[in-house]
């Protein structure tokens, strides 16, 4: 009847927790799978329930990311197929050609390890550990927020029944996040074409890899022979892998920058409450969107905005260098320009990893200054050559800055004259401003030879009205 009291969201939530954590296993598996965006496969859901119950009962401080690896590889297997001998031979030949061409375009030495060909499942399994490292700080923050929510809202009798609810919820929250991580990585395995496609080094720094199935699907959208696409992508991948092998500090720097950013994310209890009030717990689509969108992650702080800007600059420098080297190395390919444009459009649309980072750590990892960075690298190449350009990756302190991207000519001048001091740079900038007469204050000589030291008051002044007298001291 309409007048009968209906159980509220809190009642439903408490009942679900009670059944889950007490091991009764009476939760509707199809509803749980639908809310998490998971397939309603009985075997999978049974395994999921078992994992969540184990996580609740273990209550450890860490998070078991083996769940993420299992889920990622399961998704990657859907529609995936192994690399056949003909495709393997074609890819090997592409890597051989790419290595020869790349030797002419960069002084960065070749890899010692043989390039690999990954299936989607192999890529998912190989990269999940790094994804887990990146996402773990946020997973812990979400687990802690859920723990706080339960401690503040659960009735005393429920707390007593659950025992150490904090540890239980920390385990369950971590397991749920690990499942979501597996979802993201598994879906990503169907989109990436190479090991460096994400922009962040997810594989060992000495490994270059292509995903032949995804390369073929990428080539389907182009009016370009697949062999050319394969060679072009092999060049990009080798350039990316060579850079990270040569600049051994670079991989650790980028991964550490992301994890340090993620550690600054603290999800407050009121954010959990706010999100709970906005979502209808019976609406599986809303619940799934909340899990997949990273809605729990709060807005960035000023410190995080600054850290993100630095990280985006470094990613732009990496991708800009790869673009510059790839363009030079693939000049022989008739359709290299068309392939490069497709790569740029794909990246401008967000790329295969942007939504993944946004979901997992609230990062919009897009090298926004890529074109400017590539132009800067090209300027350095034209003026100083490939060896001096590539030597800039030898140490973090030698890498160009955001200011160098803005002023490549000044950067090149400084590289030509490394002994110049900061005062010299300041003097050069002031002299350049004066010669360019950016302010209009440079003294001018008229036709009679008279020097006007106040040109702003002269006849060239386009402003209307009487001119102000010169009151400056002589």
What do the predicted segments below correspond to?
Residues 1-65, 154-172, 417, 422-446, ...:
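Long amphipathic alpha-helical segments used for membrane anchoring, targeting, substrate engagement
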Residues 78-93:
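Extreme N-terminal leader/anchor segments
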Residues 91-213:
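Auxiliary, metal-adjacent structural segments of Zn-dependent hydrolase domains
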Residues 173-176, 215-233:
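Short pre-active-site segment immediately N-terminal to the catalytic Zn-binding motif
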Residues 175-196, 244-296, 306-333:
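Post-HExxH zinc-binding segment in Zn-dependent metallohydrolases
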Residues 201-216, 284-301:
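A short mid-domain helix/strand-loop element embedded in enzyme catalytic domains
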Residues 228-248, 377:
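Active-site recognition of the HExxH zinc-binding catalytic motif
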Residues 299-474:
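Pan-zinc metallopeptidase signature
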